[in-house]
Amino acid sequence: MPGLRADQLALYMQDMYKAERESYEEMPTMHDKVFKMVSVNKGAGDKVTQILGAGDLQRHTTEGQDINYKTPVQGWEFLVKYWTYSDGIALSKEAVEDTVKLGNLLKELAATWGTSERVEKETLGSTVFNRGGDLAGEWVFNGTHTGNTDSSGDLLYDSYPLFNVTGNARSTKNGGTYYNSVASLSLTPANFETVYNLATATNNRDERDRIVKNPVDTLLVEPGAELFKARRIVETTNGLPSSQTNDKNVYEGIVSPMAWDYLDDSSAFYVGKKQSKDFQFRIRQKAELRFFRDENNLGYKASINLRMGILIKNWRVWHKGGGSYA
């Protein structure tokens, strides 16, 4: 058959987009349930500067007392880089023009890309948890992009790992010290309570060390045995392990258990708030498919590319029990 016309290329592209999307949606994803999904349309990345405000309100002790005007205080700088992901394939002129089922070939190719897109998004999101305790950090936290250098490098915005333990406590802008992880914990009712209280009753402080609400709604674990443990802890009405069978389970319904296939950090468990505005999965560009002729050799090329990144603005959103901190 002769070379493909422009209208034929366009029709193939429509089928490829449909096949890619259908393949992507074949299996449910978790990154969009853990993170808040945000679409953006410009820039190689983004920088958000935290403003702490002027401080506490002052009680007036005399009539006519002047208002004390102060300059707003800058907090942390949060950076995100939009990473580009791509893949491509080259087809010879003969392979395309001699193939009677070219449409099927292209749809199968696009379907594999749909699966790959799902895998990469799940991997990007889960890396935040799997490598969040690494003392040297991880690339996913490095927001350096054109025009902006992330001074914290591969660590979180305050130059600490996302998940830090008591021996490596982080400081707020006001000087308070905090940690959001406890090492060497397995998932038990008592250990769940320890991490839950750490999140809601100890780390319920802002950058000025003032008391704030720090709600949690999710117990995030690996699938399999860890999920069964989680469900027994928060979904059992009576008779927790090591308790009387008629004792009421005080943990019932306090959070919802969720399992993520992509978690791999030594049976660690995480207590936090899903889809928080301070834990963002940003889509800079949706998957773009291309199918075109290469005039150099008269062959054809097909490709996919997309851009995405992670923006974290508050280490308090998720807390961790167990896992590694090397």
Residue ranges and their predicted role:
Residues 77-137, 219-220, 300-304:
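Long, contiguous amphipathic alpha-helices that act as assembly "spine/axial" helices in icosahedral shell
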Residues 99-108, 131-153, 206-208, 213:
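Intrinsically disordered, low-complexity coil segments
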Residues 10, 18-19, 73, 204, ...:
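Short alpha-helical segments and helix-capping/turn motifs at coil-helix boundaries
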Residues 56, 66, 79, 115-139, ...:
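Signature of extracytoplasmic/envelope-associated structural regions
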Residues 25-85:
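Assembly/oligomerization interface modules of large self-assembling protein complexes
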Residues 2-7, 149-209, 213-218, 223-326:
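Sequence/fold signature of self-assembling virion shell proteins
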Residues 2-10, 39-48, 66-68, 80, ...:
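Short low-complexity stretches enriched in small and charged residues
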Residues 1-27:
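N-terminal alpha-helical "arm" segments
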